[in-house]
Amino acid sequence: MSELYDILVETPPTKVILLALDQGLWDCERSLNELAALCEANHMEAVASVTQKRQTPETGIVLGSGKLEEAAAAAGELGAECAVFDGELTGSQIRNISTALGGMEVIDRTMLILEIFRSRAVTNEGKLQTELALLRYRLPRLQGMGESLSRQGGGGGGGGGARRGAGETKLELDRRHVHARIDALAEKLAEMEQRRGESRKARAKTGMPVVSLVGYTNVGKSSLMNALCGPSVAEADMLFATLDPTSRKLVLPSGMAVLLVDTVGFVSRLPHNLVEAFKSTLEEAAWSDVIVRVADAGDDQREEQLAVTDEVLDGLDCADIPRLTVYNKCDKPNALNFDPDILLTSAKTGYGLDALLKKLDELLSDRVHTIRVLLPYDKLGLAAPMRERGSVQVEEYREDGLYLEGIVKTEDLHCFEGYLV
């Protein structure tokens, strides 16, 4: 098994060439840099890029024929096996561009991200969400593959009309199959969401405040969680290392226990199908008491990344939830000084973690109270809220009862009425 693992690890990445149409709608260079990082996350190496500035796409092939000839030549010279387009393509555009590139495989940005999600999903829900997104992506593109379906589905006798009819029948069968699978997946995910809602209610009963780490993918959210709570969450210096939400208990300096949630990372122009498919996962942030927006201190695109994060959060009705901004990875050489309202942290060195914990305590201060109580020995069960949802700082067994000093949540204060000292 280890030998097979070593072989798989040493497999060289697939060489790809990047294609882009620059219509002036966004920073094309930055977008291509992000696309190259996405390729790396999918075990691909971008060896060249071809960009064309034009306001309107070329009919059928998006880029001009001259640019595609340039791309084909570069791919042949550099050994690229696949072309990745920085945008979304229709089925017919994929086929036409592939033909212009001599039959080379062509995928678009959305398909690349979907493939990354497919390979990274761990839980059953994550896998189902990814499959649903893939099917919704492929459904409108089945028509674009009509000609190849016709060639594959045509019979031996008869003319072209018979072959086209067979192809159309296969296309309709494909559509029905995809629609049926989409409906089945949606039903399963709805059941899972109902169970997730029940879990949230159970979690709410514990009274433990929820703090969600949100932000662009690969900014170190999982590393930050591990630095705060101790190693447990998988870390990787790559895009979309975390797809399924992970929850850990964290005790703040005040003694208050909170639930820290690591969420799926965002990316600019995240495909709509993915936003919809992973909405239940992203909605973990909407149930938070505090949202920690995490960015990479050394990334000059951090402000744009936070804007993407806020855009997604605003769509999840998180506007009224307090937000805290953290620039992680401040140990990197190109990290700079920032606004004093922004916390600088390094999950690697531990810098700034104490300040982050203190700030969380401040934001959640109205949720807890420090109290002293004396519980009769026949009422020791009343100590449970302090033990389970707060913290016990002093515990003494006295002649007349159990003396406790500690922190309790505001909603648990009524449990100790009549026993405060």
Please report, for each region that a protein language model flagged, where it lies by residue:
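Conserved catalytic network of the ASCE P-loop NTPase/AAA+ motor domain
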Residues: 10-11, 75-77, 242, 250-254, ...
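Switch II of P-loop NTPase G domains
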Residues: 2-8, 29-33, 56-73, 242-245, ...
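Short, acidic/turn-prone active-site loops that include or flank metal/cofactor-
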Residues: 110-114, 239-240, 347-349
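Short alpha-helix plus adjacent loop in nuclease-associated cores
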Residues: 111-130
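Conserved Switch II/interswitch segment of TRAFAC-class P-loop GTPases
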Residues: 22-26, 54, 58-61, 88-91, ...
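Switch I (effector-binding) loop of TRAFAC-class P-loop GTPase G-domains
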Residues: 2-4, 196, 202-209, 227-259, ...
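C-terminal-of-GTPase-core extension/linker across diverse P-loop GTPases
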Residues: 1-17, 140-219, 225-226, 230, ...
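N-terminal accessory targeting/assembly segments
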Residues: 1-114
